[in-house]
Amino acid sequence: MSLNRVRAEQPAFEVAASAVLIGQAHLGAGALLAQGVVLRSRGGSAALGNHSAVLENGVLVGWPDRPVEIGQRTVFGHRATIVGARVGDLCEIGNGAILMPGSRLGDGCILGEGTLVPPGAIIPDDTVLVGRPPHVLRSATEADRARLAALRGGQVDLTRHPGTTVVAPPVAGAHMGRLYAYRDKSPRIAASAVLFDSAEVTGDVVIGEGSIIGAGVKIIGDSHGPVRIGARVQILENTVLHLLPDNELVVEDDVVIGPGAMIHGCHLGAGTVVEPAAIVCDSSRVGAGSVIRAGACVKQRARFDDRAVLDGFPAVQVGSLDAAPGRPAWAFDPEDLPTPLPLAP
């Protein structure tokens, strides 16, 4: 049985075969979840407006305190990450943009590729925003509006279609995730770990007890070396783990890696939180109980002590924590998950 089945009475929307919907969400008429998109909604906390689209490999995550609410005829580019954010009508969100919890974009906003909107930021209508950290480039012009209208085939009217509520609860199956051997190495997955259907794990990979490997995650442990993932780790939607030759990738217990991240052959200390769309490069080491901020890039061979707060591109230490960061609100609650059946041999 699959984790991405959709039950709906009137399919006035399009969900690609490789897209994954988890939980309850409201999809407007003509809404699109393209290939590889993951939408995770706890408690019915996600809504995509009429004729809005999330393009390939995007991720949306909403929960009751921070719902995802998208207006009409808004388009998100490839690999956009939207976590607990609200976006108005007729917005254009560039490829790789990151919207963090509590942020809010007005109508007609334009975000450049890779723009990061930080937690709680309020962006007025018709703002053109770029960068990490973001800055206002200008207000949208009539030329901008004409271009956006052309991209939408001239259709910029807002409609009254009620849309459809769809429900796709996690369903445990005997073949959760896709496991691939590489030469004489095969993944070893603890019996209590949960792999969502579209996750793929290859080669010399060990995943510990109680860990969660989210939809669309790719973990590659082929000829380049071992991948060791501890207990109670969460690796969330559309994240990629891989490494260079003669290296290893170690994720210690209780680490949480947010959606859309890229983790190379590094060492992440126990209890560390990697926020959405961050990058951690080969041969770097991050101490226990640290936080890597959204969109940050930990460069090759960087070293950071325990409980460091890292941000920037490249990342530098911008603070220290007095205590371990704990599980972020955008992570999975264990009670949200199905009881997994044993993995097939």
Task: Walk through the language-model features, giving the residues of each.
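Active-site beta-loop-alpha junctions enriched in small/polar residues
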Residues: 240
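Short N-terminal helix-initiation segments at or just after the protein's N-terminus
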Residues: 1, 19-23, 176-183, 199-205, ...
